[in-house]
Swiss-Prot record:
<feature type="site" description="Interaction with substrate rRNA">
    <location>
        <position position="103"/>
    </location>
</feature>
<keyword id="KW-0699">rRNA-binding</keyword>
<protein>
    <recommendedName>
        <fullName>Ribosomal RNA small subunit methyltransferase Nep1</fullName>
        <ecNumber>2.1.1.-</ecNumber>
    </recommendedName>
</protein>
<dbReference type="GO" id="GO:0070475">
    <property type="term" value="P:rRNA base methylation"/>
</dbReference>
<feature type="site" description="Interaction with substrate rRNA">
    <location>
        <position position="110"/>
    </location>
</feature>
<keyword id="KW-0690">Ribosome biogenesis</keyword>
<feature type="binding site">
    <location>
        <position position="177"/>
    </location>
    <ligand>
        <name>S-adenosyl-L-methionine</name>
    </ligand>
</feature>
<dbReference type="InterPro" id="IPR029026">
    <property type="entry name" value="tRNA_m1G_MTases_N"/>
</dbReference>
<feature type="site" description="Interaction with substrate rRNA">
    <location>
        <position position="106"/>
    </location>
</feature>
<dbReference type="InterPro" id="IPR023503">
    <property type="entry name" value="Ribosome_NEP1_arc"/>
</dbReference>
<feature type="site" description="Stabilizes Arg-62">
    <location>
        <position position="64"/>
    </location>
</feature>
<comment type="subunit">
    <text>Homodimer.</text>
</comment>
<dbReference type="Pfam" id="PF03587">
    <property type="entry name" value="EMG1"/>
</dbReference>
<dbReference type="InterPro" id="IPR029028">
    <property type="entry name" value="Alpha/beta_knot_MTases"/>
</dbReference>
<keyword id="KW-0949">S-adenosyl-L-methionine</keyword>
<feature type="site" description="Interaction with substrate rRNA">
    <location>
        <position position="62"/>
    </location>
</feature>
<keyword id="KW-0489">Methyltransferase</keyword>
Amino acid sequence: MLHLVIADAELETIPEEMQADPAIRRFAKKRNKRVDRMILDSNYMHTSIDRYFPNESKRRGRPDIIYLLLEMTQESILNHKNQLRTYVHTRNNQVIRISPITRMPKSYNRFIGLFEDLFEKRIITNNGKELLSMEESSLGDLINSIRRDRTILLHPKGEMRKPSEFISNANILIVIGGFSEGDFISDTSFINERYAIFDQELTIWSVANEMVANYERAVGLT
């Protein structure tokens, strides 16, 4: 089993500091949504994010990169064979568990609506089957709750290795940063296996794709 943990993901509802912002309120009215139930999205709110969080404006509000990653993982051969578990840990220490049977909406706007429902309801079901669930948890507590043989952190400052050199057919937990720039907010010092897979910056979904594809080969699926 491969456990993919997307850590410190920039997926959150509108922070309290921003909820009175006129541009945010206009956008909420346009969508017929309560401000505090909308997901922060820099595609539409970059100017407001830059106003309230000037040092983080290039990082925060990136649900789009989580969407692209989940589109790939949930449609992978590994997931179809029930050998992949994906978890999204957010910057606010919320953990989203993605059921293997869950398929992401093909529309980004529908994805946003789905996850806004999740933030409000904490669980999404279909015909009695759980698709998504959310709980409060730190990264460390999440990792400790998962049975695995090895824990690996992917980090630009890690040892440079090809994925095929460190991925085996064991129960592996791999931590990938859920942000577009910067470093982890959560403590990751307890993870000793640290690797970089390329000498240039990669998107988080391309990194996840490399992990999934190499694990598929390790277990003989491809």
